[in-house]
UniProtKB/Swiss-Prot annotation:
It comes from Feline immunodeficiency virus (strain UK2) (FIV). Residues 661-679 are annotated as: Immunosuppression. It comes from the Viruses. One of its GO terms (molecular function) is structural molecule activity. Residues 1-784 are extracellular. Residues 806-855 are cytoplasmic. This is Envelope glycoprotein gp150. Residues 835-855 are annotated as: Disordered.
Length: 855
């Protein structure tokens, strides 16, 4: 080797090549190297010097690279340790075998693992080994002994697991909760209801609610008394009033356009200039006053938030009321409405009083009378006076219009009205909280479209016989000697013309807020100049409250007596009381979110077979909501309701957006989207309920949910097991007897919503496995099989690709160890070479041969 280096230091001879290849093989046996690093060609038995020289010529580039690598890398004990990979594989096999022993229950192997040594056979010993076995050990190998222990331990482990599962299933039975049972119950008086209105072509009311008006169901169920929609009459009235006027705020731009004003000579000499025309939306005031406020619009009230209406007259369930005419301000004329005379018994201030007393005159015995009275008004205007050239402020056209200066003193304007019937008014009453004195009346008047005037409605106030002292109240009397009174005639006679005026404003009190509506500009926009006429358009079903007048027993001549036998109550109609009376027949009911199911129900066995869940559901449907008439069933109505909500894209987008904010992974939209009021409280409740239900393991298709007994017992929830009575009970009675449990179950949900300590403990004790695989319940059975097959095949192929080499090696080693053989692999040689024998030795020697003979 030294001589070769002396001659040519760049040439690598056979001796150095042999060492370099040993280094390469030792390096490849590291952890990062391949499983089979190969053999050293220079160590093949029988190789000649000529062949070594040929190998050196062929492998010279490779050998040069190895030499450079040795020179660059510092060889230390930690670098490229020989047989390190073999040791790693050995320890890996021991780890795998330990996991297998642990899985099959052979746990003692882990304890004895460190005590086991390594069996070494020295093949150079000349003296044969002697057998030394006891009678118990003779004929039994170590593999047979440990295989018996393995079988016994595995059997005991699985028997123990099976026994534990049986004991757990028999002793722990979860409480069953029925979600959304098919029944309706009255709401509590303290509950908050969410509602909205629907009216044709009214932007202030929700458009999509119109599809819900026709969702009705005939039913023969008996519902106990509860709150009606009339209980919320004042809140509904206040909201409708705000809806009617919220689009008419001062400052809103109705029309806007630019226009050029030219002089006599056109735009010469800079005589033209540009102006911007802005018209506020004052027209909205008159539209709302003449439609909404007077009750000319048919409005339906629809409940949201999962509530329904039960019509006591028609025995029907619905989501919306029938179309109602709901006046929003006090009127002399209105729909039929009851009243009370004895004011000491009136507990509600909104109920109208059936009369008026003034000094010794008592108007009582009031009754509502339908009337077809009409008012006819005629406006005339004198032509003398100046004419102004003004821009038409209500038409989006660049044109000029001549109109008389009706505000000038030279222009005579007359607005006179008459009535078709004699109207005697019994008393003075408040008129829109205004300071009106004397005899007066207000009504709405409609003007038809003509060549010079557009279609319009006006509110007209007629006042006559004001009296000498306007600071005193009107008495409708004729006696001037009455003290503290201003005698006037309160009768409006038929076919007599009275001087009237267009009402350009009114004042309303909503809750504690007094709002004044100034409609001066709105009246002017309707082109009131000129001659025109209008006729009242009171509904034919409206009437007034007519009262009888009686004198008291007092004979004081200085006090006013009855001027007339009968009189009409002016502004008698109270909108809140009228709305309450119209809504009294609609009882507010709801579908419960859940119903506690007694264990006796689940364990109930009829004569032939066990009552399954679908049998219970059918029985409950028949007992509770079976339709007696030809109308649709309530279940079908709820389904249609869900379809209506599903088509309302705006609602779905808003609720979905809210769900994204709260990061919910389950959305039970079909059953929980009953909350569509788009109110903050409703959406929060929807989110909380959806969150709690998903944590309880209830998805959108799961009507029966199991609550863990630990969570159930924490709240001391006990249930009467005798209420089932073999099915002889209605769902209404069932709900009433378990009503207290519903409240306790609601506490569980609230604990989950608020994430307090008890709620978190309850969530931790839920069945995690059901939460993870709960979504599988939504997949049909055939899809489950198909999906399972695909996943199984894919997983099997993946495991086979990844684990096949290790698996084959493990199986080979296990078989060899069980049989007691040690595999000795010799390097491969060429086919023409004589292959050395590869022997399998049993316990270090061949059968019936001594060690000398083997050697």
């Amino acid at each position: 080797m030294a001589e070769g280096f002396a001659v040519n230091r760049q040439w690598i001879g056979p001796e150095e090549a042999e060492e370099l290849l040993d280094f390469d093989i030792a390096t490849q046996m590291n952890e990062e190297g391949p499983l089979n690093p190969g053999i050293n060609l220079f160590r093949v038995p029988g190789i000649t010097e000529t062949e070594k020289q040929e190998y050196c010529n062929i492998l010279q580039p490779k050998l040069q690279d190895l030499r450079n690598e040795i020179q660059e890398v510092k060889l230390e004990e930690g670098n490229a340790g020989k047989f390190r990979r073999a040791r790693f594989l050995r320890y890996s096999d021991e780890t795998i075998l330990s996991l297998i022993h642990l899985f099959i229950g052979y746990c003692t192997y882990l304890c004895k693992r460190n005590k086991l040594g390594t069996l070494v056979h020295n093949i150079d010993i000349e003296a044969p080994q002697e057998e030394c076995y006891s009678n118990r050990e003779r004929g039994t190998t170590v593999n047979i002994k440990y295989s018996r222990r393995c079988c016994i331990g595995t059997t005991a482990l699985y028997l123990l697991l099976l026994t534990g599962i049986i004991i757990y299933t028999q002793t722990t039975q979860a409480q069953v909760v029925w979600r959304l049972p098919p029944l309706v119950v009255p709401v509590e008086e303290s509950e908050i209801i969410f509602w909205d209105c629907w009216a044709p072509e009214e932007p202030a009311c929700q458009d999509f609610l119109g599809a819900m008006i026709y969702l009705k169901a005939s039913t023969n169920i008996s519902i106990q008394e509860g709150p009606t929609l009339g209980n919320w009459a004042r809140e509904i009235w206040g909201t409708l009033f705000k809806k009617a006027t919220r689009q008419c705020r001062r400052g809103r731009i109705w029309r806007r356009w630019n226009e050029t004003i030219t002089g006599p000579s056109g735009c010469a000499n800079n005589t033209c200039y540009n102006i911007s025309v802005i018209v506020p939306d004052y027209q909205c005031y008159l539209d709302r006053v003449d439609t909404w406020l007077q009750g000319k619009v048919n409005i339906s009230l629809c409940l949201t938030g999962g509530k329904m209406l039960y019509n006591k007259d028609t025995k029907q369930l619905s989501y919306c009321t029938d179309p109602l005419q709901i006046p929003l301000i006090n009127y002399t004329f209105g729909p039929n409405q009851t009243c009370m005379w004895n004011t000491s018994q009136i507990q509600d201030s909104d109920i109208p009083k059936c009369g008026w007393w003034n000094q010794i005159a008592y108007y009582n015995s009031c009754r509502w009378e339908q009337t077809d009275v009409k008012f006819h008004c005629q406006r005339t205007q004198s032509q003398p006076g100046t004419w102004l050239r003004t821009i038409s402020s209500w038409k989006q056209k660049n044109r000029w219009e001549w109109r008389p200066d009706f505000e000038s003193e030279k222009v005579r304007v007359s607005l006179q009205c008459n009535t078709t019937k004699n109207l005697t008014f019994a008393m003075r009453s408040s008129g829109d909280y205004g300071e009106v004195t004397g005899a007066w009346i207000e009504f709405g008047c409609h003007r038809n479209k003509s060549k010079l005037h557009s279609d319009a409605r006006f509110r007209i106030r007629c006042r006559w016989n004001v009296g000498d002292n306007t600071s005193l109240i009107d008495t409708c009397g004729n006696d001037p000697n009455v003290s503290g009174a201003n005698p006037v005639d309160c009768t409006m006679y038929a076919n007599r013309m009275y001087n009237c005026s267009l009402q350009n404003g009114f004042t309303m009190k909503v809750d504690d807020l007094i709002m004044h509506f100034n409609m001066t500009k709105a009246v002017e926009m309707y082109n009131i100049a000129g001659n025109w006429s209008c006729t009242s358009d009171l509904p034919s079903t409206w009437g007034y409250m007519n009262c009888n007048c009686t004198n008291s027993s007092s004979t004081d001549s200085n006090k006013m007596a009855c001027p007339k036998r009968q009189g009409i109550l002016r502004n008698w109609y109270n909108p809140v009381a009228g709305l309450r009376q119209s809504l009294e027949k609609y009882q507010v009911v709801k579908q419960p979110d859940y119903l506690v199911v007694p264990r006796e129900v689940m364990e109930y066995k009829p004569r032939r077979k066990r009552a399954a869940i679908h049998v219970m559901l059918a029985l409950a449907t028949v007992l509770s909501m079976a339709g007696a008439g030809t109308g649709a069933t309530a279940i079908g109505m709820v389904t249609q309701y869900h379809q209506v909500l599903a088509t309302h894209q705006e609602t779905i987008e808003k609720i979905t957006e809210a769900l994204k904010v709260n990061n919910l992974r389950l959305v039970t939209l079909e059953h929980q989207v009953l909350v569509i009021g788009l109110k903050v409280e409703a959406i929060e409740k929807f989110l909380y309920t959806a969150f709690a239900m998903q944590e309880l393991g209830c998805n959108q298709n799961q009507f029966f949910c199991k609550v863990p007994p630990e969570l159930w017992q924490r709240y001391n929830m006990t249930i009467n097991q005798t209420i089932w009575n073999h099915g002889n009970i209605t769902l209404g009675e069932w709900y009433n007897q378990t009503k207290d449990l519903q409240q306790k179950f609601y506490e569980i949900i609230m604990d989950m919503e608020q994430n307090n300590v008890q709620g978190r403990k309850g969530l931790q004790q839920l069945q995690e496995w059901e939460d993870w695989v709960g979504w599988l319940g939504n997949i049909p059975r055939y899809l489950k099989g198909l999906l399972g097959g695909i996943l199984g095949i894919g997983l099997g192929v993946l495991l086979l690709i990844l684990c096949l080499p290790t698996l084959v090696d493990c199986i080979r080693n296990c078989i060899s160890k069980v049989l007691g053989y040690t595999v000795i692999a010799m390097p491969e040689v060429e086919e023409e070479e004589i292959q050395p024998p590869m022997e399998l030795r049993r316990n270090g020697r061949q059968c019936d041969m001594s060690e000398k003979e083997e050697e």
